């Protein structure tokens, strides 16, 4: 057993609230006095349908989702949504637009381009413009008014980039399709500004295995009949999310996280905590006299994924190793970026971030 508290800074699957894990432990063999473990429940049983209903309603309340939006709990991860969004929403359109701001939006653009006859245009490219050290301002996006949609990722986990204000387009422009996997429920935004939102659960929602999709009802009219039903949003909605067996346990766990968020005071309260956590780490980096380096423009720094390095690969490796020995786990940066990355999603307690900041200062004292 570790001498230190264990803090999980993984980018995903990520930390889950301790209270949620405790509830899941207590209900592992007997859910709510039913005698059934959730993992063994039929997805069509009244017991599970109640779990699904409450998860959907709690998410709708947390995000203030308007009535004309449908919520789905699907499988396949956010990467499947790169394809599903294009397959369902681009049908009959000559073009769709994509904004590339980092690793995952780049992959989304590439995948969308493969799966539809619609031309996927680059509305902006943060790599070409800023070497992924800043974000293309929304007002500079080259959006075609008659495009099917505009796809973007609001937070880039690999590069440590995040739009400070959640982007929205003016009336009459194409609907926004947004990958919110790594920041959904971390701050307030207006769902009505978007046509479709998707998010893999394993960062801010719950364990891996479920993907949340929030889609405006009128866009479902675009879904073509000649794509497989399993990839058709309308097929899932027409069957109340039961087209195939959903990820029952991941949905149950996500529902527990939604209840935990409500108990914390909702998204507005968790946003304030997230702001303080990010501030704690960035102040430590900026106050290190150059020992720690974060090259991202300050107004584009992510509050979810804080990337940094020492400028010495061997010292970075030593940092990751020594941090883990003190219970600060999974801080290694993404393979294409290197350095360190601290993912500080909703469930990461402020105490964990402060412990990391203390370790960073101590490490600098010893090796600076």
From Swiss-Prot:
Superkingdom per UniProt: Bacteria
Residues reported to bind L-glutamate: 44
Main location: cytoplasm
MF GO annotations: O-phospho-L-serine:2-oxoglutarate aminotransferase activity; pyridoxal phosphate binding
Record InterPro entries: Aminotrans_V_dom, Aminotrans_V_PyrdxlP_BS, Pser_aminoTfrase, PyrdxlP-dep_Trfase, PyrdxlP-dep_Trfase_major, PyrdxlP-dep_Trfase_small
Keywords of the record: Amino-acid biosynthesis, Aminotransferase, Cytoplasm, Pyridoxal phosphate, Pyridoxine biosynthesis, Serine biosynthesis, Transferase
GO cellular component, one term: cytoplasm
Cofactor note: Binds 1 pyridoxal phosphate per subunit.
Requisite cofactors: pyridoxal 5'-phosphate
The keyword Cytoplasm is annotated on this UniProt entry: yes
Binding residues annotated for pyridoxal 5'-phosphate, in chain numbering: 78-79, 104, 157, 179, 202, 244-245
Catalysed conversion reaction: O-phospho-L-serine + 2-oxoglutarate = 3-phosphooxypyruvate + L-glutamate; 4-(phosphooxy)-L-threonine + 2-oxoglutarate = (R)-3-hydroxy-2-oxo-4-phosphooxybutanoate + L-glutamate
UniProt-listed PROSITE patterns: AA_TRANSFER_CLASS_5 (PS00595)
Post-translational modification N6-(pyridoxal phosphate)lysine, affected residues: 203
One protein family per Pfam: Aminotran_5
Cellular localisation: Cytoplasm
EC number(s) from the headed UniProt entry: 2.6.1.52
First-level EC class: transferase
Pathway membership, UniProt: Amino-acid biosynthesis; L-serine biosynthesis; L-serine from 3-phospho-D-glycerate: step 2/3; Cofactor biosynthesis; pyridoxine 5'-phosphate biosynthesis; pyridoxine 5'-phosphate from D-erythrose 4-phosphate: step 3/5
GO annotation, biological process: L-serine biosynthetic process; pyridoxine biosynthetic process
Similarity comment: family membership: Belongs to the class-V pyridoxal-phosphate-dependent aminotransferase family. SerC subfamily.
Oligomer status and interactors: Homodimer.
Function: Catalyzes the reversible conversion of 3-phosphohydroxypyruvate to phosphoserine and of 3-hydroxy-2-oxo-4-phosphonooxybutanoate to phosphohydroxythreonine.
Name of the featured protein: Phosphoserine aminotransferase
Organism: Neisseria meningitidis serogroup B (strain ATCC BAA-335 / MC58)
